[in-house]
């Protein structure tokens, strides 16, 4: 039987920009995506720590090394610049999966990898 498991998490990312009238959803620095094991176009669950909003969207690959986490389109209405978010990706598996997690500081620099 297949279950859904957490496979990747970017913990405590800071929203750096938002733009409502834009095609897309969440843009993540390509370097951070790689470290967390998240791919462009992948479905993610985003939890806003500041306002408790939760939303599902897809990932846009951002500029490598920019440290940007940007909300676009309707998702931009669910967070503000400076809000801290948790970004999670999941997978189907018939056995438990060990999630890859990166923890960020307020400048979106990696402070811990698990």
UniProtKB/Swiss-Prot annotation:
Catalytic reaction(s) noted: L-aspartate + H(+) = beta-alanine + CO2
InterPro entries: Asp_de-COase-like_dom_sf, Asp_decarbox
Subcellular location: Cytoplasm
Record's cofactor remark: Binds 1 pyruvoyl group covalently per subunit.
UniProt family annotation: Belongs to the PanD family.
Cellular-component GO terms for this entry: cytosol
Alphabetic keyword roster: Autocatalytic cleavage, Cytoplasm, Decarboxylase, Lyase, Pantothenate biosynthesis, Pyruvate, Schiff base, Zymogen
Organism of provenance: Thermotoga maritima (strain ATCC 43589 / DSM 3109 / JCM 10099 / NBRC 100826 / MSB8)
Keyword Cell membrane: no
Main location class: cytoplasm
EC number: 4.1.1.11
Biological role: Catalyzes the pyruvoyl-dependent decarboxylation of aspartate to produce beta-alanine.
Primary enzyme class: lyase
Pyruvic acid (Ser) carried by residues: 25
GO molecular function: aspartate 1-decarboxylase activity
Modifications the protein undergoes after translation, according to the UniProt entry: Is synthesized initially as an inactive proenzyme, which is activated by self-cleavage at a specific serine bond to produce a beta-subunit with a hydroxyl group at its C-terminus and an alpha-subunit with a pyruvoyl group at its N-terminus.
Annotated active site: 25, 58
Name of this protein: Aspartate 1-decarboxylase
């Amino acid at each position: 039987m297949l279950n859904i498991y957490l496979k990747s998490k970017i913990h405590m990312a800071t929203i750096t920009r938002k733009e409502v009238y834009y095609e897309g959803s969440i843009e993540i620095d390509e370097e951070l995506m790689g470290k967390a094991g998240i791919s462009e176009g992948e479905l993610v669950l985003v939890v806003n720590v500041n306002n408790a909003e939760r939303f599902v969207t897809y990932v846009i690959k951002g500029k490598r090394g920019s440290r940007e986490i940007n909300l676009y389109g309707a998702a931009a209405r669910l967070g503000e610049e400076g809000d801290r978010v948790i970004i999670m990706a999941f997978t189907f598996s018939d056995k438990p999966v060990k999630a890859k997690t990166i923890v960020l500081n307020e400048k979106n620099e990696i402070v811990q990898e698990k």
